[in-house]
Amino acid sequence: MRKLTLAFAAASLLFTLNSAVVARASTPQPLWVGTNVAQLAEQAPIHWVSVAQIENSLLGRPPMAVGFDIDDTVLFSSPGFWRGQKTFSPGSEDYLKNPQFWEKMNNGWDEFSMPKEVARQLIAMHVKRGDSIWFVTGRSQTKTETVSKTLQDDFLIPAANMNPVIFAGDKPGQNTKTQWLQAKQIKVFYGDSDNDITAAREAGARGIRVLRAANSSYKPLPMAGALGEEVIVNSEY
């Protein structure tokens, strides 16, 4: 009789525990979690700057050479890269090593790229200062390219300020942009990647981070501000 009582008690306990687990699992998560002012006001403790503050920091300085990365810095170019992957290497990054992709990307596919608003503001500010504008990209070089004209047209850059795009390419273990920033004596360089910031520093330039859009095809997203650099507010678009 004692054994039957113990067995019944154990079965009852097991049923109770299982019921609790099932109840917890089937309980829906709150649809509206809510927030508060403290959470809304919370910002990552990094060096945020605005375009106006950058302009103010350059007051009194003579015209200089300034540089911009292209993809995710001045252009949201994911549509072209997305199409390239689907066309040349579905499911892999091998298309980035395919010269056929770069021929397409550098000769027309930027017609599908969207100019970023932060780039419009920055370039307009530097043109007003009389600065020389350079674009230094990690894209592979091709025999012909229409990127320079696309950028000049998109951002209304006068011929006197515009320079041909520099295709630095990508080499493992080497920051290919550094030598170009040095050669062109670029004093300020804007980019979305860690390599852009380190290239600027290696070249003795001021590296300023532009935020990469969350829906960029280039993942993972970099940790902006992790290198102690200036990061432009609202620069993801």
Swiss-Prot record:
<keyword id="KW-0460">Magnesium</keyword>
<comment type="similarity">
    <text>Belongs to the class B bacterial acid phosphatase family.</text>
</comment>
<feature type="binding site">
    <location>
        <position position="71"/>
    </location>
    <ligand>
        <name>Mg(2+)</name>
    </ligand>
</feature>
<keyword id="KW-0732">Signal</keyword>
<feature type="active site" description="Proton donor">
    <location>
        <position position="71"/>
    </location>
</feature>
<dbReference type="InterPro" id="IPR010025">
    <property type="entry name" value="HAD-SF_ppase_IIIB_AphA"/>
</dbReference>
<dbReference type="InterPro" id="IPR036412">
    <property type="entry name" value="HAD-like_sf"/>
</dbReference>
<feature type="active site" description="Nucleophile">
    <location>
        <position position="69"/>
    </location>
</feature>
<feature type="binding site">
    <location>
        <position position="69"/>
    </location>
    <ligand>
        <name>Mg(2+)</name>
    </ligand>
</feature>
<keyword id="KW-0574">Periplasm</keyword>
<dbReference type="GO" id="GO:0003993">
    <property type="term" value="F:acid phosphatase activity"/>
</dbReference>
<dbReference type="Pfam" id="PF03767">
    <property type="entry name" value="Acid_phosphat_B"/>
</dbReference>
<protein>
    <recommendedName>
        <fullName>Class B acid phosphatase</fullName>
        <ecNumber>3.1.3.2</ecNumber>
    </recommendedName>
</protein>
<feature type="binding site">
    <location>
        <begin position="137"/>
        <end position="138"/>
    </location>
    <ligand>
        <name>substrate</name>
    </ligand>
</feature>
<dbReference type="GO" id="GO:0030288">
    <property type="term" value="C:outer membrane-bounded periplasmic space"/>
</dbReference>
<dbReference type="GO" id="GO:0046872">
    <property type="term" value="F:metal ion binding"/>
</dbReference>
<comment type="subunit">
    <text>Homotetramer.</text>
</comment>
<feature type="signal peptide">
    <location>
        <begin position="1"/>
        <end position="25"/>
    </location>
</feature>
<dbReference type="InterPro" id="IPR023214">
    <property type="entry name" value="HAD_sf"/>
</dbReference>
<feature type="binding site">
    <location>
        <position position="192"/>
    </location>
    <ligand>
        <name>Mg(2+)</name>
    </ligand>
</feature>
<keyword id="KW-0378">Hydrolase</keyword>
<comment type="function">
    <text>Dephosphorylates several organic phosphate monoesters. Also has a phosphotransferase activity catalyzing the transfer of low-energy phosphate groups from organic phosphate monoesters to free hydroxyl groups of various organic compounds.</text>
</comment>
<keyword id="KW-0479">Metal-binding</keyword>
<feature type="binding site">
    <location>
        <position position="177"/>
    </location>
    <ligand>
        <name>substrate</name>
    </ligand>
</feature>
<dbReference type="InterPro" id="IPR005519">
    <property type="entry name" value="Acid_phosphat_B-like"/>
</dbReference>
